[in-house]
Amino acid sequence: MLTKRQLLVLKEIIRLFTESGQPVGSKTLMQELPVHVSSATIRNDMAALEDAGLITKTHSSSGRVPSTQGYRYYLDHLVEPVRVSRHDLATIKQELGQRYSKMDEIVAQSAQILSNLTSYTAISLGPEVNNIKLTGFRLVPLGNHQVMAILVTNNGNVENQVFTVPPSISFDELEKAIRIVNDQLVGLPLVQVAQRLRTDVPSMLMQYLTSPDGFLDIFGNVLKSAASERFYVGGRLNLMDYLGDSDIHELKKIMSLIDADHGDLTELLGGPIRQTPVQVRLGPELKPIDLANLSLITASYDVGGHGTGMIALLGPTQMPYSKMIGLLDVFREELAKRLTDYYANFDQ
């Protein structure tokens, strides 16, 4: 069981490391802690935190840095959101208050505003997409091993694409696979459909298809088209500012995620639900890929009968969480107000 002072030391290590990017030593802590404590006592507290796995020692310095476990503990128990500055609040209100002719424009601009305010990569998901549910899926044979895949959603949207089916897969097998999809996935939000395509659905399809990959590709591509209409990313090049040359593989993974597959991006946002309006997930907690040196802050917003949407920030693990959580909480409220005002013109 950690003492209050040890938790204070952890909190201060995270603050100082966030600000400087440098390992934090006992002498620095002795100067920065709000209570007077000897250097020896601080070293003992740091040893206890290290034994608990909350901080770790770097090879190049005698200082300590937070571990992933330390950040998780901090986010779950210690973080205190900072009130957004008057300047940032005025910027949010002014930018969202511009004249927009389409809801898509508001959602797209929200990602750009958020990325400009934070210098991180911002992702914005419109309310209707986050609330769209699958209502049906079918394949229509066109001959010459071609089929038209048709996906229908509860907002009346119909997506269709033509695909070539491998000769090894018969249409009878495809019909059985379609029945599984409709039995298991109809009625679910598209976010959950994308998740289940990567978890339990493939094993179900194995009962009828020798290799379900071809069918999953067809369904996944149509799903991606249906789920990506109001999905916007702002500041994608900001990733290059906080990922160094040694993280080039990480950068390629993220760019591929953002540019190539909105189904994956939807799954990235759809993590485990916590009972807080703003949630933070660290690299190892992110799916479908582990983004080791990054964190994702997500916040949902409610537009009444028009559904719920989501905004998110993707940035370095050592981002200033207190500030970012406070900013995102205010931003989601202001975005919800702006979209509510927009819809009011059509609800009268």
Swiss-Prot record:
Positions in coiled-coil regions: none
GO BP, one annotated term: negative regulation of DNA-templated transcription
Record carries keyword Transcription: yes
InterPro entries, alphabetized: DeoR_HTH, GAF-like_dom_sf, HrcA, HrcA_C, WH-like_DNA-bd_sf, WH_DNA-bd_sf, WHTH_transcript_rep_HrcA_IDD
Superkingdom, taxonomy of origin: Bacteria
Keywords assigned by UniProt, alphabetized: Repressor, Stress response, Transcription, Transcription regulation
Gene Ontology molecular function: DNA binding; DNA-binding transcription factor activity
Summary of the function given for this chain in its UniProt record: Negative regulator of class I heat shock genes (grpE-dnaK-dnaJ and groELS operons). Prevents heat-shock induction of these operons.
Family assignment from sequence similarity: Belongs to the HrcA family.
Protein name: Heat-inducible transcription repressor HrcA
Source organism per UniProt: Lacticaseibacillus paracasei (strain ATCC 334 / BCRC 17002 / CCUG 31169 / CIP 107868 / KCTC 3260 / NRRL B-441) (Lactobacillus paracasei)
Name of the gene this protein is made from: hrcA
